[in-house]
Amino acid sequence: DKDAGHETQVCVCHFNSNEMKPEQILLDVHTHTIASGHAFSSLQEMVHAAAEKGLQILGITEHAPGIPGTCSPIYFRNLHVVPRKMYGVELLLGAELNILDYEGHIDLEEFYWKMLDIRIAGIHSLCYQNGTIEQNTSAMLGAIRHPYVQIISHPGDGTADLLFEPIVLAAKETGTLLEINNSSLNPVRHKVKAHDNNLEILRLCKQYEVPVILGSDAHISFSIAQYDHIYPLLQEVDFPDTLILNDKPEQFKRLLKPLPA
């Protein structure tokens, strides 16, 4: 939290398409394997693809039980059997948790949260009853303030209408990272609000100097570290390169919200 020194202070320079190239991307921490039920690559295939793309860190964040067809909780309990470095890539094994209600409660249980290397959370229509913009914002703020939630996935995808300024300010205060999600911006997803929502998030993060994490949300190995739908938005708002963490693995690890004592 702010008092513990987690409020982020970052110097600002501006995004330039010539400064950050795909080969400079060193981490992607929102991906899924076949364990999520509707993805198409194995864990080893995902890590191998990450190594081929030159990544230093890969996060594999399987869907939590609120999503039909995903793995059962025992999957997360057994993550200890997986090496945390493969093909030269550091692995962060975790979950994409589901925001369940207007208070920001998430699924799984604390017993499992503690076993994860990384914890992201988002709103998914399959397990969230859409409310008013105030109710949805309350849900998101509750998740941002949750001590175990480190990253908010696809806040701009339009699944729920949100007030973004309080969300960005809460992220800054708590050290919770906001994701700009490439998959949400893919035209084949037909998420009509995603473009404008993500532009607003980026403008607010620029205004308040809040770092963001780009997420591929890859459900197949070919999509790892694929941010092609995000780059035009970064250029449109002249987003500061120093606030993008995907080419800064050590800074990312420093800024990742620590677990409760």
Model-derived features: positions:
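Active-site mouth loops of central-metabolism enzymes
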Residues: 29-43, 98, 124-132
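Cysteine-centered motifs
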Residues: 11-13
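His/Asp/Glu-enriched short active-site or ligand-binding loop at hydrolase and phosphoryl-transfer sites
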Residues: 177-190
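Short acidic/histidine-rich active-site segments
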Residues: 63, 210-224
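Histidine-centered divalent metal-coordination motifs
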Residues: 30-34, 63, 154, 219
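Extended substrate/RNA-proximal surfaces in nucleic-acid metabolism proteins
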Residues: 21-22, 64, 69-180, 235-244, ...
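Histidine/acidic-residue-rich catalytic or RNA/ligand-binding cores of hydrolases
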Residues: 37-41, 70-71, 161-168, 188-202, ...
